[in-house]
């Protein structure tokens, strides 16, 4: 029996497991079992986190769904869920070491898919940083702090920062001071100029105070609990709530260093196989294949699931063609948004309509595989 072990309870891991389990029986009668290893008991719909930190906007059950229940249709002979954290990988011995309730558990594999995702450089509400209980508590803490704050600064003007500032300003633009700090000359750097211009205008319409070409040093906590930031121009900015949205780090600490690039991302070839590691693959945010964006992860998941089935059927896998086309869509408050496909700017009404709910209705269908 072939044992496929998948690491990660996010989009990459859960989607790949479902796609394989739903389709493998159509192509081969070879015996198999899938084990999904996740440090989170629940799938976190972090796409909606910028709105989720605002009190009363999104109920907890629309942000979190239990993973194991979503795979109940396959039966214990075909699927097993392991709640634990990958701590070590023995490529030669085809063994993964997982910390399960403080105990080192060794799991042998024939194929290993690393879809462990990434985390923010500074822990916050946008990524899980260790457990479902932990990120739930972080969300609740931020909701309380947002409610109490009079002045909020969002540092980092990439998609997460822009969406977060937009959501906050839509709700509180006339009652709280919302500041967005960008280290570059505009927001959404490296996006088409028409998109950055539109985003900036929409933010300003919502009364966001956008500071460009501005760096912020790590904040100092004052005796009253407020945060003091020193900006690159020397200005001291005192705020009630500091929300960092810049930078992600791959969750690859368990992977031997020879398989990582200088930034810690897992190096893969055109088949998503980890370079130099037979039978080991990596997709999504943890790999060096494409930008860490949802639609790229979806494409990668489809491809790796098909290749796994081909391998079990004794057929050669097919190479993946990475996309050279940049794309983005983001909500800026509930009534505006912008985005692009390549150099083509998407109409704001289209982005707003598509992303109106931040896709929370797709959470249950993602976890149980019914939308794949």
From Swiss-Prot:
Q: What pathway or pathways are given for this protein in its record?
A: Secondary metabolite biosynthesis
Query: Where does the UniProt entry place glycosylation sites?
Result: 251
Give EC number(s), comma-separated: 1.-.-.-
The UniProt keywords, alphabetically, are: FAD, Flavoprotein, Glycoprotein, Oxidoreductase, Signal
Induction (free text)? The cluster is expressed in rice fermentation medium. Three regulators are located in the cluster (ptaR1, ptaR2 and ptaR3), suggesting that the production of pestheic acid is controlled by a complex regulatory mechanism.
Stored Pfam families? Pyr_redox_2
The answer to keyword Oxidoreductase applying to this record is yes
**What does UniProt give as GO cellular component?**
cytoplasm
Determine the domain of life of the protein's source.
Eukaryota
Q: Under which main EC class is this enzyme filed? A: oxidoreductase
Q: Which family does it belong to?
A: Belongs to the FAD-dependent oxidoreductase family.
- Protein name (Swiss-Prot/TrEMBL): Oxidoreductase ptaL
Question: Which organism encodes this protein?
Answer: Pestalotiopsis fici (strain W106-1 / CGMCC3.15140)
């Amino acid at each position: 029996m072939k044992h496929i072990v998948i690491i990660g309870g996010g989009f990459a891991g859960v989607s790949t497991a479902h796609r394989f389990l739903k389709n493998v029986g159509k192509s081969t009668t070879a015996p198999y079992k899938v084990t999904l290893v996740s440090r989170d008991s629940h799938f976190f719909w972090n796409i909606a986190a910028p709105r989720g930190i605002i009190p009363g906007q999104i109920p907890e059950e629309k942000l979190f769904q239990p993973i194991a229940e979503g795979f109940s249709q396959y039966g214990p002979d075909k699927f097993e869920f392991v709640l634990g954290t990958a701590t070590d990988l023995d490529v030669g011995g085809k063994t993964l070491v997982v910390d399960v309730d403080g105990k080192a558990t060794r799991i042998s594999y024939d194929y290993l898919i690393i879809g462990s995702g990434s985390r923010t450089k500074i822990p916050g509400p946008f990524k899980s940083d260790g457990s479902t209980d932990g990120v739930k508590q972080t969300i609740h803490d931020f909701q309380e702090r947002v409610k109490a704050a009079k002045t909020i600064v969002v540092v980092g003007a990439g998609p997460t920062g822009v969406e977060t500032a937009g959501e906050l300003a839509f709700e509180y633009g006339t009652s709280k001071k919302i500041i967005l700090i960008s280290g570059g000359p505009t927001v959404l750097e490296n996006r088409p100029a028409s998109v950055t211009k539109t985003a900036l205008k929409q933010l300003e319409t919502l009364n966001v105070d956008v500071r460009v070409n501005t760096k912020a040093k790590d904040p100092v906590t004052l005796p009253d609990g407020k945060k003091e930031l020193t900006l690159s121009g020397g200005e001291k900015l005192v705020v009630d709530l500091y929300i960092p949205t810049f930078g992600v780090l791959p969750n690859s600490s368990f992977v031997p260093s020879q398989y990582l690039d200088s930034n810690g991302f897992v190096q893969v070839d055109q088949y998503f196989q980890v370079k130099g590691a037979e039978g080991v693959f990596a997709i999504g945010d943890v790999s060096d294949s494409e930008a860490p964006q949802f639609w790229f992860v979806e494409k990668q998941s489809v491809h790796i699931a098909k290749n796994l089935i081909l391998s079990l059927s004794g057929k050669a896998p097919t190479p993946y063609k990475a996309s050279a086309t940049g794309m983005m869509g983001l909500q800026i408050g509930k009534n505006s948004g912008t985005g692009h496909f390549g150099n083509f700017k998407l109409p704001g009404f289209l982005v707003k309509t598509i992303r109106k709910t931040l896709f929370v209705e797709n959470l249950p269908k993602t976890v149980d595989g019914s939308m794949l």
